[in-house]
Amino acid sequence: MVTAEKSRIDCRHIDVLDGIRAVSVIIVLIFHFWQQTWIFPVIKTPWLASVGITKIDFSNFATVGYLFVDMMVLISGFLLFLPLMRSIILGEEMSGWKNYARRRIARIVPSYYFAVLLLFFASALPTGAYATTADALKDLFAHLTFTQTLWVNTYIATPLDVVLWTVAIEVWFYVLFPFVAEFIKGPRNKNRQSFTPAYGIFFIFAVFNIINYVYTENFVLKGNVYLAMRINQFPAFLGVYSIGMLGASAFVLIAKNCRRSRIFNAVNTLFSVCSILLIIYLINDCVATQERQVWQVTERSKLAFVFMTFIITTALSSKWYRWLFSNKFMRFLSGISYNLYIWHQWLAVQCKNTWRIPKWSGEIPPNMLNITYWMNRYAVVITVFAFAAAILATYLIEKPFANLIMGRPVFPLFAKKLLKTANSADEECINEEESAPLSAEVDSFADTVDSDKPAENAAANPWGEQETDRNDSDCD
């Protein structure tokens, strides 16, 4: 029997997003690794031979894994709009835009700037990657201002990290979002009754999709254009963000008006599985077409809608099914996914072409000669390097600097140990007045550390994404 408290749908911390984001980043990683290794991800299943299944082939996901960058962008948009929809539908109070900007900076900037500056000064400049000083300064300026997608030589041809373009797309939507949110909320005066948030939502949805359509038809599909340069510009993702907005409003409405039950959970589990099958169908359809980039841009909104359906139904599914996407391992992967996305491709390329790890000689890379033992060793090396870099960058750069920006202890574990030490000292201290200053100082640390818990932190900062949220980015 489900209690009233357990039957409520949590629209603050959506635990399954950890796993969905992690899986999306891993699929993008598989795509980039496949480009370098030429190894197709095929799992042999001799134990299933009796039922006619001798292997599970993920090759199609490898060849068009870049499509899951859209999933990362969609998750980002969904989470951005979620607090706004809670405010409109549930009447929750929102914190100010200053806190919003602070959280966005804390989440994005430390790891991103670290990667840009390290690669520029430690790799690109020493290796003479730029023809002129002007080219170098332009590339650096474009990346520091998140405008690298505007020029070919700072985007596709950059000697820095190409995958950082997705971060730039998200940052520009972060900049746009406050204006969109204020418009949706409507005027704060007596005329508010004539302009409800629902009108604002549908108006923004229409405007975003019109811009997306006009851009696609006139700047992507018409004429002799460089598709790779056009399909991932900011206007091409407005349709995806609009679907994230509708998904957030739908999810909060469901959370307000529905309660969990065995039948409710089971039905959503079934719909989630059907969504996965539909995603597989769309992936196969993309692989089957000759113009995959054209398919990507023309079917982007359709794919985003299926992704959104998968996200919502998975979040509303049965507990055992949600656990697949919200267990500790998935939370760990989600925690390092931003830096995993940032570093995986650059390290893979450097290992093969610059450092030649594993060792090889000659002019033709071993994967092009189908030297399988080298290809397998190389796949292991770049996987280890990517995860090692992600873990180090997350716990030595991203989290400490994010804590610093948010006014939290830079190293929370140290603060907790300090608290334990102070408590022990308090017990042994004869003079309570002498121990009070230290105890008060450490208690303030403890309050800050404890506020890092996902549910409590979401309540205190409704504009912030859930604490385990990482992009990506993917995203992508």
Kindly label every feature range from the protein language model.
Residues 1-9, 31, 321-330, 345-447, ...:
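C-terminal "closing" transmembrane helix and its immediate cytosolic amphipathic cap
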Residues 454-459, 463-467:
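SF2 DExD/H RNA helicase N-terminal ATP-binding lobe
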Residues 5-26, 63-64, 97-102, 108-109, ...:
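Functional transmembrane helices that form membrane-embedded active or gating regions
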Residues 138-168, 173-303, 351-358, 363-385:
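Aromatic-enriched alpha-helical transmembrane segments of multi-pass intramembrane proteins
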